[in-house]
Amino acid sequence: MARTKQTARKSTGGKAPRKQLATKAARKSAPATGGVKKPHRYRPGTVALREIRRYQKSTELLIRKLPFQRLVREIAQDFKTDLRFQSSAVMALQEACEAYLVGLFEDTNLCAIHAKRVTIMPKDIQLARRIRGERA
């Protein structure tokens, strides 16, 4: 019989299935608790990374407009009563606030990474603000 060349093939992965013992087969064939399927869960961090990519792509404001407007009016009450705001003024304040917060969180994340952590903590925010010169 002539010898033939063998070509490399991709394996389908895994081992060939083995026959189960009678006791294991009997246990597996019994119905599991009413056939209730567990809901699918992503591994920790997967959804967070997806959200990071999503929000980095987008340009829309992340803080809701009306709650932010109420906050602005509440803070302005301390300085002068009966102040009126143009809608464009509130939008400009919101744009500036969100840009500041995003930058602060970027610096905070760098501080956490520098400390060999992936979780940001209040001390990271304090360090970032101190390095920026915002707080003594």
From Swiss-Prot:
UniProt modified residues of type N6-crotonyllysine: 5, 10, 19, 24, 28, 57
Modified residues (Asymmetric dimethylarginine): 3, 18
Modified residues (N6,N6-dimethyllysine): 5, 10, 28, 37, 80
Listed Gene3D superfamilies: Histone, subunit A (1.10.20.10)
N6-(beta-hydroxybutyryl)lysine, modified sites: 5, 10, 15, 19, 24, 28, 57, 80, 123
Post-translational modification: Acetylation is generally linked to gene activation. Acetylation on Lys-10 (H3K9ac) impairs methylation at Arg-9 (H3R8me2s). Acetylation on Lys-19 (H3K18ac) and Lys-24 (H3K24ac) favors methylation at Arg-18 (H3R17me). Acetylation at Lys-123 (H3K122ac) by EP300/p300 plays a central role in chromatin structure: localizes at the surface of the histone octamer and stimulates transcription, possibly by promoting nucleosome instability. Citrullination at Arg-9 (H3R8ci) and/or Arg-18 (H3R17ci) by PADI4 impairs methylation and represses transcription.
Residues modified as N6,N6,N6-trimethyllysine: 5, 10, 28, 37, 57, 80
Location of N6-butyryllysine modifications: 10, 19, 24
Miscellaneous remark of the record: This histone is only present in mammals and is enriched in acetylation of Lys-15 and dimethylation of Lys-10 (H3K9me2).
Name of the molecule in the record: Histone H3.1
Species whose genome carries this gene: Homo sapiens (Human)
Lineage of origin: Eukaryota, Metazoa, Chordata, Craniata, Vertebrata
